[in-house]
């Protein structure tokens, strides 16, 4: 295809084009074409029917393509900018790290590059044509024009007059440009829903012109003075053009199909002689004629008669532009554009091609080329600032966002420091920081907000760590220490105060939040014992503790303290056995009123050791317990018993004692039994290493704790408790109303001796045996034990209450029934329970004391509590469970804090009603009964352990 115009890349002008341009002299009008494009050549000249010479043309950012049609006075400068889609796509592909792509920065960079190219066009062109692919005006252009005006007035006009002083044209004016360029807008696409008539198209163009004019006037882009106006708009001339008829970017395939269709649809007027010969062969007239409408005849197209056809013919971009070119050639370019005109000769400058090239070369070098040259040096300070800070000066959005973020940063810091305490921990710091960030977000916006938010966090963190950081050592109740981290302090303190009772329960005191196990389970109660009038008088059970033999004693290593948790297969089996201990105990005891454990060693071998190993091969036999009717027991054990059974023997506990196989005399036998128990009273305890935590079923039996975490005390005789009044305030303080009663528990016991041992009993003396039966046995060898028990819970506010079942708080005498005690004795009792003093379910009370009032009977009550918390089963740590004396009020105080091998077992935050045992529980079956030793004195013996001659009730 032969083109009737010249096309070249600046500054490589062809000789033919240069020669023809020289003929024009100073009648040369330079038109700059900028804007958007969507084709692969970045061609915005399609409306003027121009395109690059080569079909393989590759557009480059910053490249200027020149077009000139001989016979005209118009030189087109086609600027290729980042706003062309093909160039924009290349810039996106050049991004090195797509994952860290910053859209705001990329947009600012492309916009600044477009402004740089448009700045050059403002100074070297008479007319600017902005090409828009959309159907409406782009509002971002207003911002572009504002930035252009800022760059020209605040930067270019500071250095350009001095740098261009050597050019002769500069002496004609001080504006450093040929004129105030006239801006025209070319829209390549017309709205599809609008009619394509002269009236509709003109109305749409006029409406767009009014909107653009108001915007440019409102933002001072166009003013009354040419010296202060960035652009010019024509007066009473159209400056908006919509391409309504021509398809500037057609689909080539559709064009080929349409051409083929038109070639087939020929009229009779256009038929050639060859076509007539073919028509003669047709069987009838119109055989090969197409159906449908015929195209409009060429005569009609060549000779339009109506106004619409003429408007369609004249409504082209070329005609639209030439009207403004003629204004430039007639020296009336600024006539009517500005109310305040400039002096004659300074309004408009037309140059010949050589002078214009010199002008273009200098401005291109100043505005474009030197910017890309990083080694360029200049003595002009203003120009140096332009080269270095051009992008920064245009990024007004970033400055705006930074300003907002600075305001938000100050507000956030002020909010953080406003209510900060003297010392505070991580939780308080996080809370204050969250409030500071919320205060920052009220002002801070935009892309820099994330970095400023991180800066705010760093400033607040530094402020916190600058002498205000809290110790934050957690207490055993998970409360942080409030002391300063850097300041020396001998003792941690969380500032939390609890109210707890002493060992005997008579006196309540304020206790600080404990940080060590010794403070929690021992030191507080030792302190309370000094100020309590009852604690100093009561008789305490002495639990075994570590007694060092050297001065450099130490805590046992973890593997040594808990051997069952490490090692090979035997230890693994032991772990499996221990893991199922709690579950087996629960299955054996839960919900039963009958005694569930036959022997001492059968279900306590994981808590206090196996009696077979303790006795080291001794032949002391364990008691046998049988259940059922009294008749069956008599037939098996005492065939010579002639007494009749009472009607309440169904729930009797039958304890059968088997005497030793050989005995010289009664006294020697008793002495031998007592000696065996004492000799089996413990393992070879370590005197150099102690147990660091609480004793549990996995603990090494040879290791003892440094201090007792349990307390067992006889607070007085059984007469101090009255079931009519309950526990009085002067005796047990802090109980809630109605929850201060113990539960009566009747236990029926029948003692049975083997036949082979009857002769042995007769030798003990008839007088002693008769006193035993008369004073203590009713109905022969049957006796009823009247026991009072109470499971006391205590919250951190000092409120105490008893439970009548695992799910119910005792509410007074009405809740006490005949079988109420069985609900607490034969069922697992929760370690934690919601305190009724508050409505919040997460305010928990803890099982702290077991009250036992022993009966006046020739038996001793045995205590063997086992507390299951998590995977641990905690015990008293004694070789044999303690024996309680008769007719006395005993109180067992449980540990305040439970600690496992390597972790703290804290109370749960909240208990669910359907899983009240999730926080831990006291295993059922903690009570046992044993016959009083024959040589026991009337005074209670606290250090006498229970032998194998007892049964669990």
From Swiss-Prot:
Ranges for region Disordered: 621-649
UniProt keyword terms in alphabetical order: Nonsense-mediated mRNA decay
Stretches assigned to coiled coil: none
Biased composition regions of type Acidic residues, renumbered to the chain: 621-637
Signal peptide stretch: none
InterPro entries attached to this UniProt entry: SMG8-like
Domain of life the protein comes from: Eukaryota
Biased composition (Low complexity): 638-649
GO biological process: nuclear-transcribed mRNA catabolic process, nonsense-mediated decay
Function: Involved in nonsense-mediated decay (NMD) of mRNAs containing premature stop codons. Probable component of kinase complex containing nonC and recruited to stalled ribosomes.
Similarity-based family: Belongs to the SMG8 family.
Name the record gives this protein: Nonsense-mediated mRNA decay factor SMG8
Organism this protein belongs to: Drosophila willistoni (Fruit fly)
């Amino acid at each position: 295809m032969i083109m009737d115009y010249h096309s070249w890349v600046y500054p490589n002008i062809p000789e033919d084009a240069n020669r023809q341009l020289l003929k024009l002299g100073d009648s040369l009008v330079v038109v700059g074409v900028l804007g958007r494009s969507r084709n692969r050549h970045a061609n915005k000249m399609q409306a003027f029917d121009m395109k690059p010479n080569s079909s393989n043309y590759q557009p480059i950012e910053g490249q200027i393509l020149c077009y000139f049609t001989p016979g005209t006075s118009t030189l087109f400068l086609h600027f290729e900018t980042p706003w062309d889609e093909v160039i924009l796509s290349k810039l996106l592909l050049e991004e090195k790290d797509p994952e860290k792509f910053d859209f705001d920065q990329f947009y600012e960079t492309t916009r600044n590059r477009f402004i740089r190219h448009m700045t050059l066009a403002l100074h070297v062109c008479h007319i600017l044509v902005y090409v828009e692919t959309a159907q409406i005006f782009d509002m971002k252009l207003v911002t572009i024009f504002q930035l252009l005006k800022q760059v020209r007035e605040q930067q270019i006009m500071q250095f350009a007059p001095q740098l261009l002083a050597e050019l002769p044209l500069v002496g004609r004016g001080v504006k450093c440009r040929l004129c105030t360029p006239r801006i025209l807008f070319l829209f390549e696409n017309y709205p599809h829903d609008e009619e394509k008539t002269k009236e509709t198209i003109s109305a749409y163009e006029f409406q767009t012109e009014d909107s653009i004019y108001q915007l440019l006037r409102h933002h001072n882009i166009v003013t009354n003075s040419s010296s202060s106006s960035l652009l010019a708009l024509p007066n009473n001339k159209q400056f908006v053009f919509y391409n309504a008829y021509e398809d500037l970017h057609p689909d080539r395939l559709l064009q080929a199909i349409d051409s083929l269709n038109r070639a087939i649809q020929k009229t009779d007027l256009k038929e050639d002689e060859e076509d007539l010969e073919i028509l003669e062969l047709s069987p009838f007239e119109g055989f090969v004629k197409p159906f449908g409408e015929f195209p409009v005849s060429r005569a009609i197209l060549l000779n339009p008669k109506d106004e619409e056809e003429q408007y369609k013919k004249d409504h082209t971009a070329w005609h639209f532009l030439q009207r403004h070119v003629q204004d430039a050639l007639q020296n009336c370019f600024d006539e009517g554009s500005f109310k305040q005109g400039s002096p004659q000769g300074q309004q408009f400058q037309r140059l010949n091609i050589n002078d214009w090239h010199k002008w273009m070369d200098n401005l291109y070098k100043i505005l474009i080329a030197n910017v890309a040259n990083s080694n360029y040096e200049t003595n002009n300070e203003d120009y140096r600032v332009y080269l270095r800070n051009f992008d920064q000066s245009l990024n007004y959005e970033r400055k705006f966002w930074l300003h907002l973020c600075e305001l938000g940063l100050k507000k956030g810091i002020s909010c953080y420091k406003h209510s900060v305490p003297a010392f505070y921990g991580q939780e308080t710091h996080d809370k204050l920081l969250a409030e500071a960030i919320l205060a920052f977000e009220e002002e801070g916006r935009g892309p820099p907000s994330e970095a400023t938010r991180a800066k705010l966090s760093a400033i607040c963190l530094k402020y916190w760590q600058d002498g205000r950081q809290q110790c934050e050592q957690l207490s055993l109740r998970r409360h942080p220490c409030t002391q300063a981290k850097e300041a020396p302090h001998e003792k941690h303190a969380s500032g939390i105060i609890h109210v707890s009772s002493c060992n005997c329960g008579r006196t309540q005191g304020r206790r600080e939040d404990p940080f060590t196990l010794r403070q929690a389970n021992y030191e507080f109660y030792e302190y309370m014992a000094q100020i309590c009038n009852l604690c100093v008088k009561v008789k305490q059970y002495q639990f075994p503790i570590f007694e060092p033999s050297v001065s450099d004693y130490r805590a046992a290593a973890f593997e040594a303290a808990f051997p069952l948790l490490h090692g090979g297969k035997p230890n693994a089996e032991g772990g499996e056995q221990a893991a199922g201990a709690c579950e087996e105990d629960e299955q054996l005891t839960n919900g039963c009123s009958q005694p569930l454990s036959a022997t001492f060693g059968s279900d306590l071998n994981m808590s206090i050791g196996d009696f077979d190993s303790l006795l080291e091969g001794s032949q002391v036999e364990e008691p046998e317990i049988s259940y059922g009717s009294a008749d069956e027991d008599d037939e098996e054990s005492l065939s010579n018993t002639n007494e009749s059974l009472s009607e309440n023997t169904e729930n009797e506990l039958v304890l059968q004692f088997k005497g030793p196989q050989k005995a010289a005399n009664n006294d020697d036998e008793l002495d031998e039994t007592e000696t065996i128990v004492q000799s089996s009273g413990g393992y070879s305890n370590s005197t150099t290493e102690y147990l660091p935590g609480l004793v549990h079923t996995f603990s090494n039996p040879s290791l003892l704790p440094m201090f007792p975490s349990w307390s067992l005390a006889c607070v007085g005789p059984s007469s101090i408790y009255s079931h009519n009044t309950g526990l009085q305030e002067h005796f047990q303080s802090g109980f809630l109303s109605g929850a201060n009663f113990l539960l009566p528990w009747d236990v029926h016991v029948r003692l049975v001796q083997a036949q082979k041992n009857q002769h042995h009993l007769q030798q003990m003396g008839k007088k002693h045996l008769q006193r035993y039966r008369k004073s203590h046995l009713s109905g022969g060898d049957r006796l009823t034990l009247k026991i009072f028990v109470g499971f006391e819970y205590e919250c951190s506010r000092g409120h105490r209450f008893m439970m009548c079942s695992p799910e119910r708080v005792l509410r007074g005498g009405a809740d006490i029934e005949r079988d109420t005690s069985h609900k607490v004795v034969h069922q697992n009792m929760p370690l934690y329970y919601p305190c009724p003093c508050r409505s919040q379910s997460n305010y928990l009370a803890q099982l702290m004391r077991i009250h036992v009032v022993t009966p006046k009977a020739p038996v001793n009550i045995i205590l063997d509590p086992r507390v299951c918390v998590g995977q641990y089963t905690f015990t008293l740590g004694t070789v044999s469970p303690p024996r309680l004396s008769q007719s006395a009020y005993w109180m067992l105080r449980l540990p305040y804090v439970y600690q496992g091998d390597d972790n703290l077992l804290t109370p749960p935050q909240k208990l669910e009603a359907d899983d009240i045992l999730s926080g831990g529980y006291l295993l059922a079956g903690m009570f046992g009964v044993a016959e009083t030793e024959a040589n026991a004195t009337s005074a209670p013996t606290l250090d006498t352990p229970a032998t194998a001659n007892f049964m669990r009730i």
